[in-house]
């Protein structure tokens, strides 16, 4: 198994409902380590930059509006096969299709208000981590 890093967002809907601690508990219980974390409130320019791959798509304006609607928690997770393990812990994007016991099955309100985001590949993880964290803010443990 390979030690790798992934990127995670606790979205505005989950932050507003005070789910940060519960989600962190699940992350750590799954054997992943949080090696960087901070709370940010994205502005329109930051949201556009982070979600640039979706620019021009029908859902892009609503996605930006949601992701700038309140603070988010961004974090870097590390562990064996962290990307796949965190994606399994999150559950499917559509909470109605997410397996019981996953974060989205338990906390998501809808497809958009689905509580969390996680990188889907090593390339995405590297890009997303670098967007929010200089290497000096990451503390492997």
Curated annotation (Swiss-Prot):
HAMAP family: NDP_kinase
Pfam families listed in its UniProt record: NDK (PF00334)
Database matches in InterPro entries: NDK-like_dom, NDK-like_dom_sf, Nucleoside_diP_kinase, Nucleoside_diP_kinase_AS
GO CC, alphabetical: cytoplasm
Positions contributing to ATP binding: 11, 59, 87, 93, 104, 114
Name of the gene encoding the protein in the UniProt record: ndk
Protein name as annotated: Nucleoside diphosphate kinase
Catalytic reactions on record: a 2'-deoxyribonucleoside 5'-diphosphate + ATP = a 2'-deoxyribonucleoside 5'-triphosphate + ADP; a ribonucleoside 5'-diphosphate + ATP = a ribonucleoside 5'-triphosphate + ADP
GO terms assigned for molecular function: ATP binding; metal ion binding; nucleoside diphosphate kinase activity
Subcellular localization(s) per the UniProt record: Cytoplasm
E.C. numbers: 2.7.4.6
Cofactor: Mg(2+)
Parts forming coiled coils: none
Assembly and oligomerization: Homotetramer.
Family per similarity comment: Belongs to the NDK family.
Function: Major role in the synthesis of nucleoside triphosphates other than ATP. The ATP gamma phosphate is transferred to the NDP beta phosphate via a ping-pong mechanism, using a phosphorylated active-site intermediate.
